[in-house]
């Protein structure tokens, strides 16, 4: 998920058993002032209560939600991870700015960060993600999907109905990023 001053975002993904295929199941924007509690409560309830229905009729909950804690409302994100065990804070790392030339891992490391609850500091889990590695993986899979003669056989696919939140605006935003080599 992503955090902005005026909204929270969630992209629900479904994976096959060995993790080699992923499907974008549902996308939603939670509008509201993220300095206030209502939008966070709504987000947490969605993560807890959402169920995806499989083709064979099973219902699956969200087992893990990664929410960006690298900018907007970091303390709110960290506090939410304490309240909802399905939500984890994640922060992107861009290694070219840190003296390293190449990333090789999607998940770089797991660390901790302090959340301030009232006047008490509490340690929270924080997952660091290699942003270049993640974007390369996503855009390689998207490129294969776009040019595939049989999209359902690819490792990544999206529903064809905008009812799942994947409307034209979603795809324009997804494809607005461009790779720049540093």
Where are these regions (language model features)?
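Two-metal-ion RNase H-like nuclease active-site motif
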Residues: 1-5
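Structural motif
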Residues: 9-11
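Residue-level signal for short segments within beta-strands and strand-turn junctions
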Residues: 14-16
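Mg2+-dependent endonuclease catalytic cores in nucleic-acid-processing enzymes, primarily RNase H-like
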Residues: 19-182
């Amino acid at each position: 998920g992503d955090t902005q001053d005026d909204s929270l975002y969630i992209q629900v993904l479904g994976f096959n058993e060995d993790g080699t295929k992923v499907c974008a199941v549902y996308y939603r924007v939670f509008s509201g002032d993220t300095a206030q509690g209502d939008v966070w409560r709504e987000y947490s309830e969605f993560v807890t209560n959402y169920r995806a229905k499989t083709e064979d009729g099973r219902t699956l909950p969200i087992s893990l939600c990664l929410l960006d804690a690298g900018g907007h409302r970091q303390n709110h994100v960290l506090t939410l991870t304490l309240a909802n065990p399905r939500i984890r804070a994640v922060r992107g790392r861009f290694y070219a700015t840190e003296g390293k030339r190449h990333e090789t891992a999607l998940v770089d490391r797991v660390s901790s960060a302090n959340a301030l609850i009232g006047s008490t500091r509490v340690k929270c889990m924080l997952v660091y993600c290699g942003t270049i590695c993640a974007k390369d993986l996503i855009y390689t899979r998207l490129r294969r999907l776009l040019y595939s003669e049989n999209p359902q056989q690819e490792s990544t696919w999206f529903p064809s109905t905008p009812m799942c939140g994947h409307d034209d605006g979603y795809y324009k935003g997804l494809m607005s990023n461009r790779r720049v080599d540093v």
